[in-house]
Amino acid sequence: MSFGPSPAGFGPPPPPAWIPPTDTERALAEARARGDRSAYYDVLARVRLYYVMSREAYDAQPDRVHRVFVRDTRTGARHWELFTDGMLPAPRTDVVYSRNSLDWIADAWDPQCPPTIVVNPGTPCELALPYGPPGTTDWSHVARQAAPSMSMRLRALHVGGVLHGPVAHGLACGALLCVNNGSLWNALAWHGHGYDGERRRLREWWGITTRAEWQYHLRNLLACEASSSVWEFALSLRRTISRDFGGHVDTGYWRQAVATVIRADSEGSTVITKDGVTRTDPRPESETEARIEGVQRLIGRITRYEARMRADGILAENRYVTSVEAWDLGRASKMARWGLGARFATLAEAESAVARAGRTAAHSYRSWPDFSAGYILGRCLHFDEEEFGDWYQDMVAAHRILMSEAGSPWLNIPFR
């Protein structure tokens, strides 16, 4: 399909000085410059598009759609503005966005809608689209035939995103999830699923509905206290044995050491507190043995995951996971951004939290592969139940992308 000799709404090719923020805007600008409507529509159909929504109206009625249309100051005509993710401004408390597909936008028409949609207004990839009843426009037919891509890939902001330094390092700690979801790994000014989508994500996955609850979960993640303390107990004991005896730790010896430590701890002890000396009571033998059995089963799970990770190239031969703190720190890097998208956080708070996650990770691990292995093990202990299903396989695929693609932060940002 061609644009024809002088298509309305299209001007000269984008100026050479303009740098597209992401691969999406580059593809749109190139299609626009070629006069290729089909290619332009196809790009739009394969990404999520953002539009301004009323925060006040959503907070009052979150189960409804709240679109905001604008009026052109020059012509007085009303239109609906849509944006790709690279064109969004930094989050503000008074302006929020929702996100949806081009197909949904075609179906969302009603008689009160303006006759025109404008994509990325004021940019070299801007295009005005006629907006009418579903199925009546050429772009809506393309939207029916394509859908936003759900395949994982490495994406970055080339304009407006940090690529080096402490904040970039902290953002890269969340890169496994970003690659898995196809989101921009270095977008600190986060919009994510949109204001409504980020609120829904935090509510459904974390039970977070207020700023105080978001702060609580972020603090726990940054302190590496959100995951099971038993996981870290088992791994830290193996670290101690390896450090004391140099190198490989036999699994049988590790299991025996767990039993010895737990039994010694169960006998009771004298603890010095601010109120003086306190004696803790011994634990019942049945409780102690049950705890030993549980941790030893955990050791079996850990070693089986590690064996699979070695086979899949995540862990080098004779290497093991030193800690699962990466699971908390990687999520902290994302939680900071999710909170910003949901307007529970300010940009400064998100930046500070992301940088702190990166600093803590650099103290706990030696390299990106070490960090990745800790994150993957923590995720699998939390979700996977030794099925080696999507919870595991998705992270293996994301790890391989981050360890191989030229633009990967893990290949361009020193871990320490």
Tell me the role of every PLM-derived stretch.
Residues 2-39, 68, 72, 76, ...:
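Polar/charged low-complexity regulatory segments
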Residues 41-44, 53-55, 81-82, 87-99:
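Extended, Lys/Arg-enriched charged tracts that mediate electrostatic binding to polyanionic substrates
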Residues 46-47, 112:
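Structured helix-beta-strand junction loops
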Residues 49-84:
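Amphipathic, interaction-prone secondary-structure segments
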